[in-house]
Amino acid sequence: MITIQQVTTKKQQKQFVQFPLDLYKGNKCFVPPLYADELAMFKPNYVYNEQADSIWYLAYNEQGQVVGRIQGILQRAANEKWGQSRIRFTRFDAINDKEVADKLFQAVENWGRELGVQEIVGPLGYSDMEREGLLIEGFEYLATFEEQYNYDYYQTLIEDLGYQKDVDWLEHRLTLPEGGLDERIMRLSKKCMERYNLRFDETKSMKKFLKKYVNQIFDLIDYSYNELYGTVPLTEALKKQLLSQFKLLIRRKFISVIIDEKDKIVAFGIGFPGIGEAVQKSGGRLTIPTLLRLLPLLNKPKVVDLALIGVVGEYKNKGISPAMLPLLANMMSSVEYMETNLNLEDNHAIRNMWKHFGSIQHKRRRCYIKQLNPTQE
């Protein structure tokens, strides 16, 4: 007999955050989020509360053990932006048991019906700055710190409940060709930069770089990602939090921007050192031993995770894609490979760029959709 309880106590909050750590204990591919960041979402002043409402549920077996969890989100800003009537599900984790999944999703779906919304989609977090998508290919690969890992049986549990594909994301692993990028690409890049009087910013100091460009970068993220699936505008509070979180990970050599003659950014790429293994060993807790493991990975990583890449709108149709390739190559020059993280499968402009590198498409993630109030025939 499985019972479902809404998370209302501090004890349950800790159980909610702890459960995936227990479920994936010993798994070589799972990388947890930071434990403190997950607990923070229960605080009344959580950064997303100004644009979203949330509910959390736990599933217990007859012995009182946690066997599953799920979160529901009413992302008001997303519904307003896209003209939709949706809730999102996220942070679904469970043992391989149909009853557990059925009852967890039933709880979230009923919450959505009480709110009067028409659809449920997910896995999607509060924004695309959170982990999103259900892994359906690539279970043998280590997850990046930015993305979620899940067992392969999740797909069956979810699809058996009537959920259907809404969108897929693809992930690639890129390597720099021996000898660097093709000479023709380098010539095209140079011509492109000269034609529009563009150049790479060469500010050495990370502090000076952020002071000079951080506001531009956030504006460009909002602009260049505006039309992508499920995105919501960045609030000022969220920008402040993201900057605080990213300062731990950001290294100057993994941020590359192309600027015009007025020092305005026209294209950018941001990568994070791959820290999955270090976080994996700590269970997401930033202890002193964890920090000691992190430092070498931050300064001399084997892998760089591509976090963000974008072009200013007016330059998208000017053919500056060749100039973006050296930008990425610079980020990859000191590592074994780059993880692209999520690219929508129909984002051909981005995916075509990967053809100029050694590239394997090794992971696929899916966002599902289900009608909560289907029309009666």
Positions of PLM-derived features:
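Flexible loop/turn segments at secondary-structure boundaries
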Residues: 66, 76-79, 128-130, 179, ...
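Acyl-donor binding region in acyl/amide transferases
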Residues: 80-162, 282-357
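Acyltransferase donor/substrate-recognition loop-hinge adjacent to the catalytic core
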Residues: 148-229
